[in-house]
Amino acid sequence: MSEIPADLSYTTEHEWVQRTGDGTVRVGITDYAQSALGDVVFVQLPDVGSDVTAGESFGEVESTKSVSDLYAPVTAKVIAVNGDLEGNPQLVNSDPYGEGWLVELQTETESMQAGLASLLDAEGYRAHVAD
């Protein structure tokens, strides 16, 4: 069974979301997603300062098996991208919830709270991947 940390929120598209401040979150793909993808060879991420829209694609993860879109969990501005992935994309496989994070996003606290409220908790995500 894939690792599903209880302290994170999840999307049905297999991204995890970790609140890092009042209006900020860190986003990555889940252990389930990286396992299904296989060996990640390239990650395309947006530029810092870009706006992303909840439910819309903001980048791609390319593996030896396929290319998968990344979907924004909330509408926000990109405030950081994981530059380590450029030279070491396999971090997404080896540490999806740590060193393999993708982007950090920022929005107004109220918007963030509303966006996070629509996400799955660990049990909800576990049920989603079990289907």
From Swiss-Prot:
Superkingdom field: Bacteria
Coiled coil: none
Family of this protein: Belongs to the GcvH family.
Record-level GO BP terms: glycine decarboxylation via glycine cleavage system
Protein name per the record: Glycine cleavage system H protein
Record text on cofactor binding: Binds 1 lipoyl cofactor covalently.
Native source organism of the sequence: Mycolicibacterium vanbaalenii (strain DSM 7251 / JCM 13017 / BCRC 16820 / KCTC 9966 / NRRL B-24157 / PYR-1) (Mycobacterium vanbaalenii)
HAMAP family hit by this protein: GcvH (MF_00272)
Gene Ontology CC entries for this record: cytosol; glycine cleavage complex
Cofactor(s) needed for function: (R)-lipoate
Quaternary state and interactors: The glycine cleavage system is composed of four proteins: P, T, L and H.
Domain called Lipoyl-binding: residue spans: 24-106
